[in-house]
Amino acid sequence: MENLHWEPLAPACRVLVSREHTFNTDTILLAHFAAPKHKERCIDLGTGCGTIPLLWQTNYTPRHITAVELGEQAFSQALRSVSENGYEENIEVIRGDIREIKKIIPHPTLDLAACNPPYKAVGAGLRNPDERMENARHECTCTLEDVAKAGRDVLRFGGRFCLCQRPERLADAMNVFRSYGLEPKRLRLVQQRVNTAPSLFLLEAR
């Protein structure tokens, strides 16, 4: 692992980041948009370095959080971050593929799922020669359809799925969610500056 260092998330919480696996404003916005209610059972699909579960556990009162990550380095960072903050009893970090989520969560029992997925479809934009960076930016190992299917498979009836994406993918996201029985209920558009076009959307579906 290269360039590992700790970044503060809150006065009593920090996360281990690297060049390949870090967090940004989108991550923070999604964590708070998808704020868990008291005693909810939650999952973060493709947790990266574990920022969203750490923020959930620090700021809210969920019953339990499952954090799923496919990449070896990101998984290791998330695991170390959970341990560093003393959250082992509250957050379970699992190395796994969300396309095979039923191997991890066999039944639809969870209250809340969140995902900060790759923003670009395969073939859109420039490719990154670094495989880890490429997987984080393009839908190489996880498509919008994979994300929606995973949400459907883990959420109980009435459970909430929260996602962030680029505005140009909004119609795709709504259509895919509906095809998996997840009806969009809440939408927030994010602008970087006043009088500029939105750069991000946050979507909740049930």
Regions found by a protein language model. Give the residues of each.
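Conserved beta-strand segments of alpha/beta enzyme cores
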Residues: 14, 64, 90-92, 183-186
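Residue-level signal for inorganic ion chemistry
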Residues: 30, 116, 147, 205
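Conserved Class I SAM-dependent methyltransferase catalytic core
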Residues: 20-23, 141-198
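Short, structurally constrained coil/turn elements
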Residues: 9, 36, 87, 178-181
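Mobile active-site "lid"/loop adjacent to the S-adenosyl-L-methionine
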Residues: 117-146
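Conserved SAM/SAH cofactor-binding pocket of Class I
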Residues: 32-126
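Core SAM-dependent methyltransferase catalytic element
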Residues: 199-206
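Class I SAM-dependent transferase core
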Residues: 1-37
